[in-house]
Every structure is written in C-alpha cells, then in structure tokens.
C-alpha cells in the first residue's frame, strides 16, 4: 500500500508543473509587471522595480502558506472533484485577463465556480458531466470549508506581503493639487495538495477523511492555485490600510469556514457560506474604498519638508533605509519644501549627503552617506510633485 501511495504522490507532483495555469501565469505576471512599469514611467519617468520582480513575488511569496494550507486540507481529508477544479481554473484564467488582482480573490473565484457547478447539477448538463465521470460528485460542505480556508489564507498572505513594494501613483485632487497613492496589485501561487474523488487509493482509517470522499476511493493532486489581492491607498500608510483589510478578510474566511463545517449538519448552509463569501468580500472592498476616500490625503505636498512617496531599489535611498511616508525636512543642512529645493541642496555637496528626516514615529533622525558618480540624481526617492517641478529639475540638471 505504501508503494502505491508513494507512486501517486510522485505522479501528482509531476502533474503540478504540467498544469496550464502554472505556465499561463508566467505570461500574466509579466503582463502585470509591464503595465505597472508603463504607468510608473509615464508618471515618474522611471520604474520602481523591474518586470521580473512581479514574477519572483508571485512564484515565491505564497509557497509556505500554500504548503501549510495543504497540510490542513490533507488532515481534514477535504476532496474537491476534478470537474469543479476545472471550472475554478477557467474562472481564474478569465479573471487574470483583467490584470486586476482584486478580481482573483478566492471569495470570487471559488464562489462563482461553486455556483456554476451547482447549476450544472441542477440543470443536468449531461455533455459536460459525462466528460468528467466523477467530476461533480461534490460534497458541498467540504467545498464550503475549502472556500473558507482559502479566504483565510488569502488574508494571511496579504497581511504578510501585500504591502511590500507597493507601486506609487500620482493623481490630481478635486482642488487641482497632486496627490500620491499607493497601489497593491499582487498575486500569489499557492501549491495545493488535494484529494480528488476517483479510482485509486482507499483509506483504511476509520477517522480519515473527515469529509467523506464519494465512492470511498481517491487520488492525490497537486495544483497551482493563484490568489490575488488588490487595493488602492491614499488616506494612510499602505501597510496600515492593507493589513486592516487583510485581517477583515481572515475574519470573513473564518465565518465562511464555520458555516461550511455547520453545513455537515444541514447542507443548505453551504449555500449560505458561498453567499457570505461573495457578498462579504464585495462589502469589504467597498468599505475600504469609502473609508480611504473619506480620510485626509496622506501623500500630499507639505508646507515643510518633502514626503517620500516611493523608493527605487538599489539606490542611495535604499541604503539610507528611507521608508514610504517619511518626511525629509533638510538636505545638507538646507531646509527643503519642494523637489527643486531638494535637488539644489544636493548640489551643495556632491561628495556627501546628510538628511534630516521625520520618521513614521514622528521623531527626527539623521541619515548620511557618501555620494558616488553615476548614482541617481535624486537619490532614488520619488516625491509628490507636479509637472512644473519636473521641468525645474530637468533644467537644473
């Protein structure tokens, strides 16, 4: 028996890399990066990170959370039919074409897939069902719990890394003033180890799987599941806003998982879990946007000092350990309140730079370093500025 299980595990691992979504999302992720870079160059005449940064993020940041979720799914013995997995893959690919990660939330993808699967069962779509003989032998409570756990994982990965290297943007307020924003548009690969109903292995344990596998037999399947999170922030620091939303997503996922578990006793609660996930995620997105719009602009021009809107990697700004949201008040001992002042102050000492900074904790600190030939002329710092300041800096350089 152990040999058979080992063979099944090896086969499922090999199929992981043959899954169409694994390769499809390489193209999609590069497209995410291309669109981001194009927007950043249009606004700031430079990019924040290269196109491969999105690729590295997507294919590495979700590995450990995905494996942890797989352990939980395997321990519970949750089985997901092949037909439903096919629908999830198609809906995921369709959502990815929008290049908006917020549409790739598990609350949307899996909920819509469950509704489609339920509809196919209700209306007996024979041609489709015959293509997957056991593809829709669905234990709806198991899938509802699966949905809840996915949403919790989505919130966890967003809390952990969605705020990392957000993309800055500039817009014009209703008063005609430049306003800074931070955009998170992230996707994570979650490697999921699933049980799929079908001829293959049988459990000889009376307590496992917890969620019954129809027919009593199953096989293993590793799949690349892609989950997304998108958010625009202009009324606070991106880490603060994103982590608040991520916590709310985790709470939503917990509520969905509880409803899914309760549906073991009364199956219609699985439908309530789907509706809770779908409507709850929409509500959280609207709530975040309304609250953000109501808050005072965080990234705006100040009477004293320049607020850091973005930091280009591998530049002096990164060496100085500057953070988004900090305010630079003096450069080489000279007070600055616009980009022209900042650039002129740098010219007073081309070999050395000393900054006076108001940190995120409100305290003043000093950072300094040597300057070298060929380094970014603004230290790799992006500020909230208008076109006239761009022209002034260009003429000065």
Curated annotation (Swiss-Prot):
The keyword Hydrolase does not apply. Gene3D superfamilies: 2.30.42.10. Its main location: membrane. One of its GO terms (cellular component) is plasma membrane. The chain crosses the membrane at residues 15-35, 71-91, 103-123, 132-152, 187-207, 210-230, 249-269. SMART domains: PDZ. It is found in: Cell membrane. Disruption phenotype: Mutants show defects in homologous recombination, swarming motility and cell division. Keywords: Cell cycle, Cell division, Cell membrane, Membrane, Septation, Transmembrane, Transmembrane helix. Belongs to the MinJ family. This is Cell division topological determinant MinJ.
